Amino acid sequence: MNQEKKDLLYFALGVLLVTTLIVASFPLLHITSNWAANALMFVPGSIAALLLLLRRESLRPIGWGLGPARYWLVGIVLPTLMILVAVVISLRLGYAAPAPASTPHGSLIVHPAKLVKNMLLYFVISLPLAFGEEFGWRGYAQPRLIRQFGLVSGLLALGIIWGFWHTPIYYVMHWYSEHPLLGPFVMTPIDNILVVVPMAWLYIRSKNIWVPTFTHAFADILWGFSGLMFPATHEIQNWVVLQVVQAIVSAVLLMDLLSKRQQSIAPELRESPASA
């Protein structure tokens, strides 16, 4: 096993173990706040920063420029369309329903100005949290996994690690009330395996960490508010609709990343000799 593979193993184990140990203390300390769980988004980036420091590796390859404006636009349009399509389909099929207008969440549907204000507030709060994850997942792990295992296997591995990193958080915080085991241990990893491709595409094409950070925060806010305003009446069916939408988008973007033209643009997609 070469050094880069060892570092990836240290990263994965460190992220999973640290997160699990912290979350395991929540019931003992009577912590039920979602903000405490959200703070764990800094764990992947912190572990990555520690490994980079120990190896004395440069931060420059992560990409700190702003990149072309078109990828910022994609970062807005793509999650908006995906969630919009999924919500509309779920509403039509009866898998979700609008929250009553008399409730705080339902009132946002008929008060768009209030909705935008709340979304902007939470978006600003979410940006540093999203950076904590993206620095670790995209900035550190993704290019190394692709070099060592190739594009498809590397992204699959990243999606699995990313998904199971969420598992203890979602399990302890009871975020899948109807399916407390299936949700965290099966549905969440599948969700992250599918969403890892659009995030990888944005990072590779934009060549900077800010576009996936922005998209991560923006998508989290859209997903969160859509779930509050249009709660699921059938949790699994509603989830399946979103996964089908994500699978279609991921297939298209993965084919683009696998194309010869894209590999000529992004040489990092080619497997490194060090992976042998």
Task: Kindly give the residue locations of the regions a language model identified.
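C-terminal membrane module of polytopic membrane proteins
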Residues: 205, 215-276
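Juxtamembrane/transmembrane-helix boundary motifs at the membrane-water interface
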Residues: 20-39, 94-101, 172-181, 225-239
